[in-house]
Design a protein with these regions (language model features):
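Sequence/structural signature of small/polar-enriched beta-strand/turn repeats
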Residues: 1-167
Length: 167
């Protein structure tokens, strides 16, 4: 999805890679909105949102795995990249939701923002990683790192102006 004025509106749930690998790129001022979303349910999949005025608005987000779906034993690996002044708005997020899954979110560059109205769990039953670099920012109402007993979480914040703000 590329270019200013280009819009994709999906009122339902969005799966980026359920059983097959998938990539979604939101670039150069494009916008996407949907209900809840999963990146890398039982696959290795990614979403990249890049460029000023590029945005993705989603409901609850799972990055890497989906513990509610037991139809496959394949662990999910998901990555969300928010780059170069792009914005992602959501309600809540779990990174590494299912056992043996991996979920990674990278927020890089001045003006790049991941804004959540609720909390983010970095490491559900699997492994979660967040990297906030070079002036990137996350805002949320709570954060859990290594939320579940079998999970693990790692958060790295580096570079001038980089911030994770919990209110």
């Amino acid at each position: 999805v590329t270019g200013a004025g280009t819009t994709w509106v999906n009122t339902g749930e969005l799966f980026v890679g359920s059983l097959g690998d998938a990539t979604l790129d939101i670039l150069a001022g494009a916008t996407v909105s949907n209900g809840s979303a999963v990146i890398g349910r039982h696959s290795t999949s990614s979403v990249t949102v890049s460029g000023t005025d590029s945005s993705w608005t989603t409901g609850a987000l799972l990055v890497g795995g989906d513990r509610s779906d037991t139809s496959s034993s394949v662990a999910g690996n998901g990555t969300l990249d928010i780059l170069a002044g792009a914005t992602v708005n959501g309600t809540s997020a779990v990174l590494g939701d299912s056992t043996d899954s991996e979920g990674t979110v990278n927020v890089d560059g001045t003006g790049s923002l991941w804004s959540l109205t609720n909390s983010v769990s970095v490491g559900g039953l699997g492994e979660g990683t967040v990297n906030i670099t070079n002036g990137g920012k996350i805002t949320s109402t709570g954060g859990l790192i290594g939320h579940e007993a079998s999970g693990s979480g790692l958060v790295t914040i580096s570079g001038d102006g980089s911030l994770w703000q919990n209110t």
